[in-house]
Each structure stands twice: as structure tokens, then as C-alpha cells.
Amino acid sequence: MGYTVAIVGATGAVGTRMIQQLEQSTLPVDKVRLLSSSRSAGKVLQYKDQDVTVELTTKDSFEGVDIALFSAGGSVSAKFAPYAVKAGAVVVDNTSHFRQNPDVPLVVPEVNAYAMDAHNGIIACPNCSTIQMMVALEPIRQKWGLSRVIVSTYQAVSGAGQSAINETVREIKEVVNDGVDPKAVHADILPSGGDKKHYPIAFNALAQIDVFTDNDYTYEEMKMTNETKKIMEEPELPVSATCVRVPILFSHSEAVYIETKDVAPIEEVKAAIAAFPGAVLEDDIKHQIYPQAANAVGSRETFVGRIRKDLDIENGIHMWVVSDNLLKGAAWNSVQIAESLHERGLVRSTSELKFELK
């Protein structure tokens, strides 16, 4: 007997990939319900070659649903996820809304699937840039410990949604085909739809993802810091991030510097990463082999390379980490959580509702 699975935000960049990942999943599924806003309700999508009409998301959409995958923005999750839990579903939320809620486990299945065991009806999927870094760092943390993490990201525009993809393609065409000066291209979305100014991304790099906080870091950077500490259950671990948007469509890349508690031999570090589930070692500088964003598109794995000792700090290590931000960074991690819920016997209704109905 299979599950009824709902996908909220089914027509978006992540939602469409959730459908694809669910089609390829080992999760036993009897029925899929596709939900969206009024703008997309009525569209017809396919699941395993069957037409499925997209329905409007309402408070009553979750009757009979076992698992609900949310990727329609934090406000949608805040409004509807508690109703899904009340109806008996387990929610896997791909937005930031519940990530720091102490009643909600924040899960990368390869790293901390056990955190789901006492769930209260909602499991949060971490930020895309956090997820791939966790896959790369966990095998090192397990063997040698971590005393510091510093990361600089090179993030694809798809992390800002389909509208950002469309804007980037338009801008590049205007520069290449029409000869428009890159500085003169009109922008409406990036670096953050919620901020006062917008800048072109074509032939540019924007050192801002999301809006700035009071401490001069962006919310994206603080997500990486706070989520890393929560997932690793190390609240005192020093973590800092600089997040940059670059003009590629898919796959995030990260330059990660860590300091380990115990000195870690580089060849042993490479072996630990190569053996870790979900990680692929691509590190052969003699043959110029290292992770590339273009090569990661469409893959579920996280690719790690350029692993090398710091020149001055004995326990310092640098690496390059790449993954498809819409798959492992979002859709696949969400479906993978659903698979883990099934495997661990955790697809169950929650007796006590701990989330506010709005």
C-alpha cells in the first residue's frame, strides 16, 4: 500500500523537480496531489505519464494526504503547513520558515536522519548552500572534529526562482545579441526581490543574496551559519559565510575552509569523503579533474575536490564543493527525507499540534 503525497508549489522551479524526483523515488506512492496558488491552479502537469490537474492550495487540501512536500515560499508554509499536520500529514518543508523552530528537525538524511525520529509533524529541509556543505564536511567532522568553518559561495540564479532564471537569460541576450552595456541592463529581481535596489546579474557577480541583517551579514549568510550549527548540534562552532550570486543558471559552488580539532591527513580526508553517502570525490589535479557546476546539473550527489592543506595553519583544509541546488539543494533532499521517513516508520499523524493555525 502506497502513500498519498501532496506537492505544494508544484509548478515552480523546485516543485517541478520534486515531481521528477518523486517519479524516480523508492517511496511507495499511490496518488499525487499537485497544489499551487490561484495563478497556477488549473494547469495540467504529468506524473508518471498521467495527467494531474494542479489544485488551489487551501486549508482543506490535505485530507487523506500522508506526506506533504512544501516549496512555495515561507508565507505559504506558515499558513498551510499546520493545517496539513492537523489533517494527519507529515510535512517536509523546503522553505526557511520552520528551520530554526526548536520543535522542527532540520535534516540532511546522510548527516542526521536520526533527528526525525521524534518529529512533531514537520521536518525542515535546510538551505541549498548549507546542504551541500554538510555532505562535504560531515565525514571530516566524524573523524577529526571541526573547530572553524569559513565558506564563500558562488550561487546560481535558480536559487532565486524561475523569475530570476528568466531575468538572467533576458539580460545575457540583451548584452550578447543587442550590444547593451552590461551596466545599463534593466533588473527587477536580483540581488533580492525584497530589497530597494536591483542590479543586473549578466556578466556580473553580486555579493548579496537576500537582504542584509543588522550585523551586516545577509540572511542567506546567516542561514548557513545558524543551520550548520543546528544540524551538527554544535552551537558554539564558529561558522561564517560570504554568499555571492553569479550568472550561471544551475548548481552552487563553494570555496570552503575548515580547521579540524585533530590534524587530518589529506589523503585520509579524501578517502573519508569518497566513502560518504551522497558525496563524490573529484580530485585529480594531475588530470585537471575537479568539480564543475555544469557537470553537476541533473545529479543528486555533492561533488568535492581541490582538497588541500592550508599553507600556514597545520589543521587548516581548503576544498571546493559543488552540487545541483535544485536537486540535492532542494527537491531531492526533500524527497530523500520522505524516503527516510518511510524507511524509519515515521510516516504517521501527530497527536499534539505544536504549530499555530492561522
From Swiss-Prot:
Pfam families: Semialdhyde_dh (PF01118), Semialdhyde_dhC (PF02774)
Chain sites annotated for binding phosphate: 99, 223
Residue numbers annotated as active site: 128 (acyl-thioester intermediate), 252 (proton acceptor)
Sites where the protein binds NADP(+): 11-14, 39-40, 158-159, 325
Organism: Streptococcus mutans serotype c (strain ATCC 700610 / UA159)
Functional note: Catalyzes the NADPH-dependent formation of L-aspartate-semialdehyde (L-ASA) by the reductive dephosphorylation of L-aspartyl-4-phosphate.
Keyword Aminoacyl-tRNA synthetase applies: no
CDD domains: ASADH_C_bac_euk_like, VcASADH2_like_N
Family of the protein in this entry: Belongs to the aspartate-semialdehyde dehydrogenase family.
Subunit relationships: Homodimer.
GO BP term (any one): diaminopimelate biosynthetic process
Highest taxon above the source species: Bacteria
Protein's pathway: Amino-acid biosynthesis; L-lysine biosynthesis via DAP pathway; (S)-tetrahydrodipicolinate from L-aspartate: step 2/4; Amino-acid biosynthesis; L-methionine biosynthesis via de novo pathway; L-homoserine from L-aspartate: step 2/3; Amino-acid biosynthesis; L-threonine biosynthesis; L-threonine from L-aspartate: step 2/5
Keyword Metal-binding: no
Binding site for substrate: 155, 245
Protein name: Aspartate-semialdehyde dehydrogenase
Reactions this protein catalyses: L-aspartate 4-semialdehyde + phosphate + NADP(+) = 4-phospho-L-aspartate + NADPH + H(+)
HAMAP family, A to Z: ASADH
GO MF annotation terms: aspartate-semialdehyde dehydrogenase activity; NAD binding; NADP binding; protein dimerization activity
EC number: 1.2.1.11
